[in-house]
Curated annotation (Swiss-Prot):
Composition bias type Low complexity, residue spans: 99-117
A GO-annotated cellular component: cytosolic small ribosomal subunit
The keyword RNA-binding belongs to this UniProt entry's keyword annotation: yes
Covalent S-S links between cysteines: none
Pfam annotation, one family: Ribosomal_S6
Function: Binds together with bS18 to 16S ribosomal RNA.
CDD domains: bS6
Keywords annotated in UniProt: Ribonucleoprotein, Ribosomal protein, RNA-binding, rRNA-binding
Listed name of the protein: Small ribosomal subunit protein bS6
Top-level division of the source organism's lineage: Bacteria
Annotated spans, Disordered: 96-117
Family per record: Belongs to the bacterial ribosomal protein bS6 family.
Biological processes per GO annotation: translation
């Protein structure tokens, strides 16, 4: 059964452009080989980690949103686990309602302040 997933991948911040392109190519190849559909692959840049991971205090974040099934997730996570460049990853199954962006809230007008006596 095809479901929508999102995965956050944190890699070592000092990787070169060729290594980063290789990592993103590997992720897209895995999704394509399991007949998944890639919706979004974003580089969120280098950010400070909440705590040191494998002696790194910073990491480069990638966001991946795709459609796939359970064998695709299992293979993607297996390959990420074996890659030494990957510090952490997390995959989450999305609900159908979460696929659409939330509507924007209307601006709130503030009432004039009343002076205290």
């Amino acid at each position: 059964m095809v479901r929508m997933y999102e995965t956050i991948v944190i890699v070592q911040p000092e990787l070169g452009d060729d290594e980063l392109k290789g990592l993103t190519a590997k992720v897209t190849d895995i999704i394509g080989s399991f007949k998944g559909v890639l919706h979004r692959l974003e580089d969120w840049g280098v950010r400070k980690l909440a705590y040191p991971v494998k002696k790194s205090v910073r990491g480069r974040y990638y966001y991946v949103r795709f459609d796939g099934d359970a064998p695709l997730i299992a293979e993607l996570e297996r390959r990420l686990r074996l890659d030494d460049k990957v510090l952490r990853y997390q995959s989450v199954k999305l609900e159908k309602e979460a696929a659409a962006p939330a509507p924007k809230a209307a601006p709130v007008e503030s009432a004039p302040a009343v002076e205290a006596e």
